[in-house]
Regions:
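Aromatic-rich, lipid-facing transmembrane alpha helices and their immediate juxtamembrane interface loops
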Residues: 1-194
Length: 194
């Protein structure tokens, strides 16, 4: 339940990060195909990263801690390992998800072709570096304090937030997926061009 709520917080952060990127690169803020300001894919990504890798200074591979000790050398090795694995996860993840999604739905959700050092339309070195750096900062400086704060909340409050927010966010995501995959329409609830 605590990890679920943390994932929903990350879904909101992902929504605003994507909108910030779109504002800077295209001068637009939009709904990101959602009614609510949450992108469920970031919940899934945060769970995968945490369950597989832990946090940057205490990196692991699932249950196995990669670098023993809490000295600076172990932490540095841990951070380098974490950065490289996250970079590869994002780099190949965007290619795989973008390719599969476009093949299945016939819809293109993003295109990095206009960005220097793009590898395919789905990924580029600058975006992957930026996203990896963002993950490093969030997982090292935000994740543990967030979990501590959530764990201090009354259990029933966490459970209610999980059910209410989780139901709304997953339903919103499913509406988007059905709209794109079956009706071939990306739901555009609102957009502001600057």
């Amino acid at each position: 339940t605590h990890l679920w709520l943390a994932g929903l917080v990350y879904a909101n952060i992902g929504y605003w990060v994507e909108n910030l990127f779109r504002l800077v690169s295209k001068g637009v803020l939009d709904s990101r195909n959602q009614i609510f300001p949450f992108l469920f894919c970031y919940t899934i990504a945060m769970w995968a990263l945490y369950l597989a890798l832990g946090t940057p200074k205490k990196a692991r591979w699932f249950a196995r801690r990669m670098f023993e000790g809490d000295d600076k050398k172990a932490q540095l090795h841990s951070q380098i390992y974490y950065f490289v694995v996250v970079f590869l996860f994002i780099f190949f993840g965007e290619i795989i998800v973008g390719t599969l999604f476009e093949r299945i739905s016939g819809q293109q959700l993003w295109n990095y072709s206009g960005i220097p050092l793009h590898i395919t339309q789905y990924t580029s070195i600058p975006t992957t570096l930026a996203l990896t750096t963002g993950v490093m900062v969030l997982m090292e400086n935000f994740f543990t304090p967030l979990m501590t704060r959530i764990q201090k909340m009354p259990y029933k409050t966490v459970l209610r937030l999980d059910y209410i927010l989780g139901t709304l966010i997953v339903a919103d995501w499913l509406v988007m997926m059905i709209s794109i995959n079956f009706f071939k329409v990306q739901p555009a609830y609102w957009s502001i061009q600057f």
